[in-house]
Amino acid sequence: MEKSKDISFYRRSEPSKGINFLSDISKQLLLDCLQSNTANPFFELIDNYKTQADLSFCGLSNLVITLNALKVDPKTKWKGIWRWYSEENIMCNNIEKVKDYGMTLSEFGALLNCNGVKNKIYRPVNENFALNTVIDMNNINKTLYDDIKENKYSCVTCDEHFNSMIPFNIVSKEFMSACALASAKYNTFFMMCNLGRKGLNQTGDGHFTPIAAYNAKKDIGLLLESARFKYDSRWYSIEDIYNSLIEKDSFTNKPRGFLLIEKKEKEGKKLKWMKR
């Protein structure tokens, strides 16, 4: 036991899938995206990107990155006279719970809502899923709804906030459209993935990562990596990313998925989401 305490690692070897963000090929891929206007989230995200502050903080740190990239005012002091988001001052967040259990996709969406950012959840389904299937409001996310009723997410108590976390089912072709939409729309519209690392030939379980650019010619997306002590940011095929979203979250027993996130320019303005 004494010996095991001395074991340490400096990063993992590169996974067999994907293209390293720092490679020459990556530079050309990003240049193509910039020229075709499909890397709009890139600069806002990379300007605020950082290594996650704890091993289980991929969700929380990416939440902080997202809020700061969207230029949301936290309305609370960070240090000195400055207001800024950090892992310690996210409204309604239980940081000790996140250290122990991490964060689910629904919790990520709930915390975005608590901090004034509109979002919608999409989960992958079998290709044969009927797109007109009626979603049962009584059964979806029951665990999260119970938490809300018990006031565990203190300000997420109204139906409006909960309804925005009801997931829309999506198939792979629609996922490709979502990637194109999120990368080309504008720099206040992000796509955050909650994927299973195994689908990308990486070690570990669930992970949060935004798609910062989408190369339509090669049909690949750039995933930014908050666990920089472990892996570099990489480009992956849209097929591989989608398949990694199908993996079930061991905590919720539901497929993982992604969020489309948009900053509201004006209070009450209706947001246009991906059409069904």
Describe every region a protein language model picked out.
Residues 127-225:
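Active-site-adjacent substructure of cysteine-protease-like catalytic cores
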